[in-house]
């Protein structure tokens, strides 16, 4: 009977299960449950594939650092710090990220590697704190040692290579005596004076060698002579000046303390009161001109009356003609001295007029020029023809 009862219950359960499935299927609940289960299974499978194929996070710089001895030592110090204060959660994150589950040294090994002796003072803190204390003590010792060295360097005088202390001698502010430079400057002065004297003597010889008996020279010749005197004067001044000394040599040079030499000594010229200022011979010994025609102030002025000048000129012409005729100078073939002052220096042909007529023509031209230029009377003075000297009518240099 028991077997029949069990068989009846099993049939009832099957019928009930069938009835339940049919009811749930008709209501749509069974299909929804199947879909949710199916989706959950697919999601679980996909997530499993992602976890398996996921690349682990690797820090290359940290990996290279931990491969060194110092890197492992630093990681061990940090891990020992976390273990000392029981920071388990932080340590649980630190070890996976750094991949240091193995290979880190304990406290005893770290103390031995760092040379730290475990004492009462060091047990109360992590090893990282002791390392920092020792670094600070070393820095203080170095700074105190450098300060002592700096003070010794400042207070101790510098030593020579032989070991002796050398005294520091400040630079002297007294200028050096330049005696040799002054000697050179003083040695150049006689040479400059000698050159100026030679130039002045050459000017005198050149002027004295010119013919003195010819009183009818052209105005162009007179201007050429004045230009040569001006050029010679500039040469004399330049030769006397010489090279300028330096500022250092000017202070102790005795040349600038001497008085200025007189014109007689500097230019070799001395005025002769016996000769008249208006004669032709006085032009040869005249001093070098300084500026323009201002040195001709000693000549007779041009403001005399025309009648007096005309009488004087006529008398001079008569005397010159008489002397030339007595000496027989007007007959031979002679050079025209006016051409000597020209650049071509050609020989002039024999003139049909006599020398006296040429002089008269020159004088007439000069008189006309003087009369037409009254505004330049103060600046220009005529020295071409003047009254002849009573001492000698004709002068000639004797070699």
Swiss-Prot record:
Xref: InterPro entries: FOP_dimerisation-dom_N (IPR018993), LisH (IPR006594)
UniProt entry tagged with the keyword Lyase: no
Modified residues (Phosphoserine): 152, 156, 160, 202, 301, 326
Cell compartment(s), UniProt: Cytoplasm, Cytoskeleton, Microtubule organizing center, Centrosome; Cytoplasm, Cytoskeleton, Microtubule organizing center, Centrosome, Centriole; Cytoplasm, Cytoskeleton, Cilium basal body
Keywords from the named record: Cell projection, Cilium biogenesis/degradation, Cytoplasm, Cytoskeleton, Phosphoprotein
Compositional bias segments (type: Acidic residues): 245-256
GO biological process, one term: cell projection organization
GO cellular component assignments: cell projection; centriole; centrosome; cytoplasm
The keyword Phosphoprotein is assigned to this record: yes
Biased composition (Low complexity): 197-209, 286-302
Modification sites for Phosphothreonine: 143
Region (Disordered): 143-311, 328-357
Location of Phosphotyrosine modifications: 337
Sequence ranges assigned to domain LisH in this UniProt record: 70-102
Biological function: Required for anchoring microtubules to the centrosomes. Required for ciliation.
Family the UniProt entry places it in: Belongs to the CEP43 family.
Assembly with partners or alone: Homodimer. Part of a ternary complex that contains CEP350, CEP43 and MAPRE1. Interacts directly with CEP350 and MAPRE1. Interacts with CEP19. Interacts (via N-terminus) with CEP350 (via C-terminus).
Protein name: Centrosomal protein 43
Source lineage: Eukaryota, Metazoa, Chordata, Craniata, Vertebrata
Gene: CEP43
């Amino acid at each position: 009977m028991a077997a029949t009862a069990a068989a009846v219950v099993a049939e009832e359960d099957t019928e009930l299960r069938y009835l339940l499935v049919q009811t749930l299927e008709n209501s749509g609940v069974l299909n929804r449950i199947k879909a949710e289960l199916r989706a959950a299974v697919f999601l679980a499978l996909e997530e499993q594939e992602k976890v398996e194929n996921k690349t682990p996070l690797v820090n290359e710089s940290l990996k290279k650092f931990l491969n060194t001895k110092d890197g492992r030592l630093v990681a061990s110090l940090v891990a020992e710090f976390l273990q000392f204060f029981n920071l388990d959660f932080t340590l649980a994150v630190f070890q996976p990220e750094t991949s240091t589950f193995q290979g880190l040294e304990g406290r005893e090994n770290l103390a031995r590697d760092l040379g730290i002796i475990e004492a009462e003072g060091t047990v109360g803190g992590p090893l990282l704190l002791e390392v920092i204390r020792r670094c600070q003590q070393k820095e203080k010792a170095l700074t105190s040692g450098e300060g002592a060295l700096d003070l010794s360097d400042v207070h101790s005088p510098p030593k020579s290579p032989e070991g002796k202390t050398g005294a520091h001698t400040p630079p002297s502010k007294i200028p050096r005596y330049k005696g040799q430079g002054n000697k050179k400057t003083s040695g150049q002065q006689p040479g400059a004076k000698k050159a100026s004297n030679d130039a002045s003597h050459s000017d005198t010889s050149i002027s004295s060698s010119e013919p003195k008996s010819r009183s009818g020279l052209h105005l162009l010749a007179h201007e050429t002579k004045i230009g040569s005197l001006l050029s010679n004067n500039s040469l004399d001044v330049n030769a006397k000046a010489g090279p300028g000394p330096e500022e250092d040599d000017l202070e102790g040079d005795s040349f600038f303390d001497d008085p200025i030499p007189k014109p007689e000594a500097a230019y070799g010229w001395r005025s002769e009161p016996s000769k008249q200022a208006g004669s032709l011979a006085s032009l040869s010994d005249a001093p070098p001109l300084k500026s323009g025609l201002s040195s001709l102030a000693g000549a007779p002025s041009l403001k005399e009356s025309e009648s007096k000048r005309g009488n004087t000129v006529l008398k001079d012409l008569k005397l010159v003609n008489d002397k030339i005729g007595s000496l027989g100078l007007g007959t031979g073939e002679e050079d025209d001295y006016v051409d000597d002052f020209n650049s071509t220096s050609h020989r002039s042909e024999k003139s049909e007029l006599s020398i006296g007529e040429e002089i008269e023509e020159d004088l007439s031209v000069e008189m006309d020029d003087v009369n037409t230029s009254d505004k330049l009377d103060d600046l220009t003075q005529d020295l071409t023809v003047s009254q002849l000297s009573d001492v000698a009518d004709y002068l000639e240099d004797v070699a």
